[in-house]
Amino acid sequence: MSSPAPLHPRPGRGALVRGKPVALAAAGLLALTACGGSDGGSGSDGGPVTLRMTIWTGNEEHLKLLNGIAADYREQNPEVKEIKFDTLPVESYTTALTTQIAGGKAPDLAWIFENSAPDFVASGALAEIEDDADVLPAAKKLWQHEGKLYAYPFSTSPFGVFANTDMLKEAGQPTPAELIEQGRWTWDEVAKVGGAVRDETGEAGMVIRDFDYKMWDNLATVWDGWGAEPWSEDGGTCAFDEPEMTDAMTYLHDAVFAAEAMPAPGTTADFFAGEAAMTVTQISRASLLDDSFGWDFVPLPEGPAGSYDVVGQAGLGVLGNGDNVAEAVDFLAFMTNEKNSAALGRYFPQARSSQLDADTLAKSNPQLKPAQLEEVVIGGIENGKVKPTHTNQAELFDAVRAALDPLWKPDADVAKTLQDVCSAIQPQLEK
């Protein structure tokens, strides 16, 4: 191929796929490691190749960027006649992906969420790719197994707080920047300010975006401030009933039902539509902002355990038993090279040490000020902890969500509910 020297090796069909599948909730991964196959056009006979990559985003700007990179690649590699980006619904992305795999319709490349990374990486479904020294070690950890890399950490997106400064002023409340200056940017203050916003304006105070009383792992952006964990470091013991988690969940329960600082179950509020004063979300959501209100972007509030950073991650992997592994790995190398990473960083923060400075990030994130980039983005990428992950994630995720349901009632017994969560999931953690 005539593309620049790839960052990753180009194996033959299935050459670098490990063959030690683990028990998975998604049988599709086992199906792939057992029999392989993809629905992309085959290049094994020297004919033209079609590559397909599953992604979660349907955003026009995102797709324009991705298709532009694909066009550049095809110009240099005419044997690849087409590169398709197949958007799957975000709320059912992993299920849809594993269903495709189980049905013999595996893509050549796939976007993989952090919560399903352990299953994909440990299953043997992915082709090994070459490590890149420019990518921060912490960003690669989730995508490695026994010292080898099986997916490129495509997006390492720190969580922070977007604030509607106009709404806060209307409610007579301090902005996060003012609270930071006073040394009072804490979750306790968020509850007070959020409750006051609700009282004065009728709008929501604080929204944990994409939580919606379903995506419980997004609450890590709160409970990490208490030093809480859902399970032990080795993944074998439930920790929902530990004092730190009990205190964090008690705070959340009070913020929702006592202070009314956060939307209650059954209600929604979109910060970017002007319906909330503050929201916890990732830098990539900045693309949703317009000039309809004044805003700021600041680090997560401090909790009793002090300051902390949380990141969401997505990896890009090559399904290893397909017909076009060599071409897929080569395209992945091109897509994630230094030049393209700089362009992708506008929407999908890159964990490259060579690009982690405010001046470089400002070129692809013009909406954010250098101080915001330094404090939230660079600090978050360098120091952030990835949201909770575990093998058998789909089954485990559903079990936790169901066991937490009784918590979201005004008269809930927080401690007992969390004990019940552990009773529900401990057998799964021990598998």
For each of these PLM feature ranges, what is it?
Residues A127-V135, E178-Q182, G205-I208, A228-D247, ...:
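Short, solvent-exposed loop/beta-turn-alpha elements that line the ligand-binding surface or hinge
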Residues G160, G294-G317:
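Periplasmic-binding protein-like
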